[in-house]
Every structure is written in structure tokens, then in C-alpha cells.
């Protein structure tokens, strides 16, 4: 198994410096990770640095709370695409999901998916599993699929918990082979990575990608 091709090499902390961003980009080239995942501010720099590479540029939309307006998310998505983003990881409106306002959740996702797909870019939907019941996780996955998303993703890594094998298993059971499943948050070792893949993840968001690749 080529673990590198599963990994979105991630640096989303707010205090990330240009030097650290450049290091992430260099590591992604060296290890041939699937992508780098960076905040929108760094997308243009990463896109220019990776233009002669197979490494994609992923960024985050409505991050990390998901509580911005749909119009703001769409603007953010379009700006990211203009700056060279290949994939968009958006956060759902968690509060509206928990309140049972599924139409609002659906239209929010659909708007970002429309913006992404208009430019042939993949959209992943972060459902923030640590804040949801299993019933809510299922609804979030169903709404993401209905909205036309390409992936469902467990976590931002900025809330109360990250990916679990149980959540990845549940999400895969809902979306079948129709959508991708991205596990993110708390994946620190090769064992963690392999467990998530075995549970059904076909992409991993991790800041520990180099450590994972170098572990025996």
C-alpha cells in the first residue's frame, strides 16, 4: 500500500508561517503526498510551487466553524479556485444540522459544490463528527451525497475530537462507494493511518505525514 497517496499533508494552524508552509510544500513533493492542505491565504503560493508536480492543493472553506453565510462560503470557494486550489474542504452548518433544518444544510453544501464543480474541482464536506450523534452523522452524509459532494470528511481538527474508526466505518456504510471518505484529526502514526483505511477511508488529513511515512 502506498500510504503517501492517501495523505493530504496538512498545515492549518493559524500561526503557520511562510517558512513552515514552504516546508510542507517541499515535504509533499519529496514524499509525493496526494496533496497539501492549507488555509486559503497560502493557496496561491502553494499552487505556484506545485505547478510542475502531481501534488494537489487543498484548502478549507467556512473553516473551522462552518457558521459563515452560504454567500461567504461561495465567495471563499471561488477565490480559492482563482488562486489555484484543486479541492475544497468545506464545513457544514453544524448548528442547522443539529436543529433539524436539513434544507438549509443541503442548500449550503449545494452552493459550494456548484462553485467547485463549475471549475471541475472536488468538494469534500466536513461534518464535524465529534459534535454529532450517530443519527446526525448519517443525515450529514446523506445530505452531502444529495448535494453532489465528492467526499465526506470527519473533522476539522479544531473541535473536541478527530477521526475515529467507528465514525469512518459509519460514514462509509452510508455513502457506499459513491463518495470518498476522508478521515482527519488525530492521525499520528502508521497504525492510525492503516486503521482508518481499513475502516473505509480513501483519504487521510494529517499533519504527521512525514512521521507516518518514516515509521516502520
From Swiss-Prot:
Major location category of this protein: cytoplasm
Signal sequence segment: none
Domain of life: Bacteria
Molecular function GO labels: deoxyribose-phosphate aldolase activity
Residue numbers annotated as active site: 89, 153, 182
Compartment list: Cytoplasm
Swiss-Prot/TrEMBL keywords: Cytoplasm, Lyase, Schiff base
Enzyme Commission no: 4.1.2.4
GTP-binding in keyword set: no
One Pfam short name: DeoC
Reaction equation(s) it catalyzes: 2-deoxy-D-ribose 5-phosphate = D-glyceraldehyde 3-phosphate + acetaldehyde
GO terms for cellular component: cytoplasm
BP GO annotations: 2-deoxyribose 1-phosphate catabolic process; carbohydrate catabolic process; deoxyribonucleotide catabolic process
Pathway(s) served: Carbohydrate degradation; 2-deoxy-D-ribose 1-phosphate degradation; D-glyceraldehyde 3-phosphate and acetaldehyde from 2-deoxy-alpha-D-ribose 1-phosphate: step 2/2
Lyase listed as a keyword: yes
Family according to the record: Belongs to the DeoC/FbaB aldolase family. DeoC type 1 subfamily.
Biological role stated in the UniProt entry: Catalyzes a reversible aldol reaction between acetaldehyde and D-glyceraldehyde 3-phosphate to generate 2-deoxy-D-ribose 5-phosphate.
Full protein name: Deoxyribose-phosphate aldolase
The organism of origin for this protein: Latilactobacillus sakei subsp. sakei (strain 23K)
Gene: deoC
